[in-house]
């Protein structure tokens, strides 16, 4: 079995467990990005895709963080940054502790370096343009102080400003700033909003505005021999996010997007301790 096929097989096992957990605890979830496109275009993985990501409405997302440590299988670890633990992500990841997938940006961290399933929250997009500008500013502050890393792919100005801001802020204060930013950016509800947005997916996706109705429920579609949920308004979501999502990209773009230092679907990351930075 090729590395990519092995990763897809293990990712699907994780996704099936995750979806079953959400069903059991009445939590709404849906495949997003390439997983949702794959469900529609390929009835499974996009052939070169190497992971599955999920969206959840914010209230379900926060509930997941409470319920998972109590009721989930111990082989699946929910990683979410908090005051005493920073994993350099802006969102929840579910890690399979029986596998190895060590990312360069986490190589020096002491955490479960298993294959990850990303879970991203959806938030309301305020109607008022001034409030929307405030929301984006708070989301950028959240991104910097939650990840606590310098963004490398969003231009020299952002890199320079982030370096100064992080450098000037004591570690003891960073958590307070990030929690304040999180509170401010997520304070909007359906009454004062006319859309849904992604605040934890990076600056590009922060600009997106989707119809509220697109994420009111999910529908299940065939996916690699099982059934996976996608947003009920998948066309409005995917068209806004990706344009002509049913047309595959050029051949030179059909490559996995994620890098890793060590990948092993048969051995736990604990067997590789000492071979990477942590």
For the regions a protein language model found, what residue spans apply to each?
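N-terminal beta-rich core of secreted/periplasmic extracellular enzymes
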Residues: 127, 140-141
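Active-site nucleotide-donor binding segment shared across nucleotidyl transfer reactions
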Residues: 19-52, 56, 61-62, 213, ...
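Short, His- and charge-rich active-site/binding loops that engage polyanionic ligands
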Residues: 136-138
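A short secondary-structure junction signal
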Residues: 129-134
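Short, surface-exposed, charged/polar-biased interaction segments
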Residues: 43, 50, 85, 140, ...
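Conserved catalytic core of two-metal-ion nucleotidyltransferases
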Residues: 2-25, 68-127, 147-243, 248-278
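Conserved SAM-binding loop
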Residues: 64-66
């Amino acid at each position: 079995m090729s590395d990519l096929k092995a990763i897809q097989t293990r990712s699907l096992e994780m996704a099936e467990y995750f979806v079953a957990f959400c069903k059991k605890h009445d939590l709404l979830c849906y495949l997003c990005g390439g997983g949702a496109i794959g469900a529609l275009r390929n009835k499974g993985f996009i052939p070169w895709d190497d992971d599955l990501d999920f969206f959840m409405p914010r209230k379900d997302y926060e509930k997941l963080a409470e319920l998972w440590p109590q009721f989930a299988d111990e082989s699946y670890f929910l990683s979410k940054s908090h005051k005493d633990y920073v994993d350099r992500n802006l969102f929840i990841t579910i890690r399979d502790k029986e596998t190895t997938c060590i990312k360069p940006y986490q190589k020096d961290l002491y955490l479960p370096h298993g294959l990850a399933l990303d879970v991203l929250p959806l938030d309301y997009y305020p109607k008022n343009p001034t409030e929307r500008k405030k929301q984006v500013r708070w989301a950028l502050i959240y991104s910097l102080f939650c990840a606590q890393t310098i963004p490398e792919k969003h231009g020299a100005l952002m890199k320079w400003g982030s370096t100064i801001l992080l450098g000037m802020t004591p570690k003891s204060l960073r958590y307070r700033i990030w929690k304040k930013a999180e509170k401010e950016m997520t304070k909007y509800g359906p009454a004062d909003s006319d859309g849904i947005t992604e605040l934890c997916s990076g600056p590009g996706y922060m600009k997106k505005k989707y119809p509220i109705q697109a994420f009111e429920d999910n529908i299940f579609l065939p996916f690699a021999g099982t059934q996976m949920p996608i947003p009920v308004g998948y066309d409005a979501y995917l068209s806004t996010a990706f344009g002509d999502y049913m047309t595959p990209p050029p051949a030179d773009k059909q490559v996995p997007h994620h890098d890793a230092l060590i990948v092993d679907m048969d051995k736990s990351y604990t067997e590789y301790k000492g071979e990477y930075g942590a």
